[in-house]
Amino acid sequence: MTSIKTIKSRAPKDYLVFALDVPTVSEAAEYVHLLKNHVGMFKVGLELFVRGGRRIIDTIHDAGGGAKIFLDLKLYDIPETVYRTMNAIAAMGVDFATVHCSGQKDMLAAAQEGADGQVGVLGVTVLTSMSADDVRDAGYGPEYIENISRLVMKRAAAAAEWGFAGIVCSPLEVSAMKERFGKGFVAVTPGIRPAKGLVSRDDQSRISTPGQAIRNGADYLVVGRPIREPDDSAAAAAAICKEIEEALK
């Protein structure tokens, strides 16, 4: 199982996670081949896993040049189902897998038990697409509407309580999270947008540049469209690695 505590020296690319948000295994395989020397981890989400299943995991193992694998299924179900699913995920040889922190405590405990020390469980706190209005519409009170970070920290505390490897949160909450839970508690951050360049149909609300996320203490930066949409995806990934390198100095 991957642990930040065991990583003595990390290259800039080791912080970069490419989101394989594509519809087919063949297209994903092309990106794995293209980016294996430019990113340290590949993220497999719901659409690709539903379409490709275990094949995409095997593809990354075979062609990813040693890159890590983040299976982002955001499990949320009754405890027994989550336990059995996480146990099956652990057998695939992935490095991280996600579960929603908004679930009951027994579900969180089941996720950690099912992982059996073979995969790092990450708690999804609040989606980076959520705004204050979304939090209000979900039925939360003023305490969380006025400060989404409070809801993130509440859910991060649940993840820490049950021994998760870390959480998924916006770059804006990383600094406070590290201060409270320590540097060894992994922070995986979506909502990353390069200092230069826009993306189409941007549905993220709580965002940051790669450099700022690193300075805040993020351990992994999840990037999809800013790498996928340019004509030269490898160059786009290299440019983000350059931003990471500058922030690490």
Swiss-Prot record:
Catalytic machinery residues: 74 (proton donor)
Assigned EC number: 4.1.1.23
Pfam families the UniProt entry points to: OMPdecase (PF00215)
GO cellular component: cytosol
Pathway annotation from the record: Pyrimidine metabolism; UMP biosynthesis via de novo pathway; UMP from orotate: step 2/2
Swiss-Prot/TrEMBL catalytic activity: orotidine 5'-phosphate + H(+) = UMP + CO2
Keyword terms, alphabetized: Decarboxylase, Lyase, Pyrimidine biosynthesis
Listed SMART domains: OMPdecase (SM00934)
GO molecular function annotations of the record: orotidine-5'-phosphate decarboxylase activity
InterPro entries according to UniProt: Aldolase_TIM (IPR013785), OMPdecase (IPR014732), OMPdecase_AS (IPR018089), OMPdecase_bac (IPR047596), OMPdeCOase_dom (IPR001754), RibuloseP-bd_barrel (IPR011060)
Enzyme type, top EC level: lyase
Subunit structure: Homodimer.
PANTHER family in the record: OROTIDINE 5'-PHOSPHATE DECARBOXYLASE (PTHR32119:SF2)
Function description: Catalyzes the decarboxylation of orotidine 5'-monophosphate (OMP) to uridine 5'-monophosphate (UMP).
Name listed for the protein in its UniProt record: Orotidine 5'-phosphate decarboxylase
Source species of the chain: Desulfosudis oleivorans (strain DSM 6200 / JCM 39069 / Hxd3)
Taxon lineage: Bacteria, Pseudomonadati, Thermodesulfobacteriota, Desulfobacteria, Desulfobacterales
